[in-house]
Amino acid sequence: MKSVKLGGFTSITGLNVLNPERIQFTCEPSLDFTPTFYKEGDYVVAILPVDATLTAGTYNMTLVYGGSTQTLSLNVEAKDFQSSNINVSSTMLNMYRTSETISAFEKVRTELTATSSDVRYFSGSFLSSPATGATLLRGFGREIVLNGDTNNKYRNNGVDFALPSGTNILAANDGVVVYSGILDYTGCMVVVDHGFGVKTWYYNMAKTSVSVGDAVKKGDAVGTAGNTGFVAFDSTGVHIAMSVGDKFVCPYDAWDDSRDYGKIIIWGIDD
């Protein structure tokens, strides 16, 4: 039985599948996600996110293709997400964190996560830091309470880094730019599609350095550190998130300094 912590991700692979789009997937209890399978040589591959808000326990997945049925069990382990109270100005809240600015971001997020390249651009580890000298401020999954108001809180969907203004922000892995622009909520933002449903998101930058359609390599600059949009830290820097499909996930296992895998494992291919 595979195990994965809340907020993490794993992969499902198969052989002898000519039409991966015909794979039927169900899960009990629900994972609130239907994976997309992509061709990788003789294999089909799906990256499966485990949302941080799910309940720990055993999830029984059933996959049907043609006349074949396979049942897989996934052990979802609990994870203790810490909480922080952050004080931000009323100006910051009223300008950048409103129902309107969040809705505008959600619209873009929904559009971007609806599709992904069927080419796997990523390989090996993802960068654990956006630049030399970056300081990790707050990690994935932390509950952020704003100004002590428990009715105004959110779960950090990525990792916050402090960096001097203007420092180049580096792409975490190879991919293609699918968004480069500015939103009130995220500020200057770039989104890179790494293929197979995996994307990285770069918020709060001073400016972007790439355009939609640009191919980037791991370590290429996508923008510069700044503090645009809604910023819940007292410095310049960048917020970096990773998503699989429409779920934001913890990137740590894919980082080059991970104590575990250090990359996205495609079972049967990369393990």
Placement of each model-derived feature along the sequence:
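Catalytic cores of extracellular degradative/oxidative enzymes
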Residues: 154, 159-164, 197, 208, ...
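Short, well-structured beta-strand-loop connectors
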Residues: 168-178, 210-225
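Zn2+-dependent peptidoglycan hydrolase active-site motif and core
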Residues: 171-209, 235-242
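Conserved "cap/hinge" positions at secondary-structure junctions
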Residues: 63-65, 181, 194, 220, ...
